């Protein structure tokens, strides 16, 4: 959604009815593979190597008018977007988040209207044909005493099990997880090699647990926002902001965390700066990186050093912003390096590309587009490694529209000029996920 002033392509502004962004060109380049002789900054993959992952991008959201839980996904890896949204589950919904199951299917946890009990739904494991099928919602209960929820977050743990975190109306932090498989002893009859006499042996086997989900467990702390991230070693890290705009982190102390005691204590890490946004992500060296936005609109950076440890670097800046920024997202480029995208208070979008993780060398903030109103940004990569930027922009009726553009090539500094409209209004909330079980 570019600004209304030329030469940028037009988008809806706060004073005009929502409209599809006007394009400067309808041409779209196909993805280009890395060429020999690329700059040293892009040498994480061999020169000339191509990138491909069997995946497609999907947006899960809630419809503002009917409260429907809906989704829209690329029709194939790197493929186009359909015109219509599809309903995931019947009924009206209040808040949701999405992630992936152990086998790569999209999973959604959401609150149905009229109840505090949350529901869990996944893509059907037996997909046949191009039409997405979803399992029936399964209730996973509600945290005791919760009346509403401020933020939901989902991550897979070291075993691939889904863990869900939330903050409730009182700022309490809650956790629920899929129970691990249990070991049972079974007797089997076998015939040892070189003999003809069967014998009975006892072996250990993994079986699904009797109860699929744990009870709701209250973690320590009081937060208004929380984000969960699976780290390189499989342990989950949590990042949170409280009502005083203080920033905190903690992580699982061991790979299979089942109790509150299996978490490290919360550590306040704001160094006195009030923070409003956070974007944690795993970097190319395996360490967890946290990018966070101060109340003054500057993006700061800290990271684990070494990777997997509980020691972090001092706050640093990947680039100063003359115009304060208000929204931030982080993604991984095809070569494994980090890409940041932010929008400033003049609604100008800029990116900041990591050139070298070891030396923390960055491109600096580079303007590349704009919007006509406040927006929320998300980044994820296509099957060919090109990043896709999603911009959910506020409309005159108080709902949101959603548009997307791609990098012109993997690791490119150029972006498509034409925004693809996924919705021109009527969205309440979205989450972008990478479906690892696309139709092919």
Predicted regions and their residues:
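A structural motif
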Residues: 22, 26-440
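Intrinsically disordered, polybasic Lys/Arg-rich low-complexity tracts
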Residues: 1-36
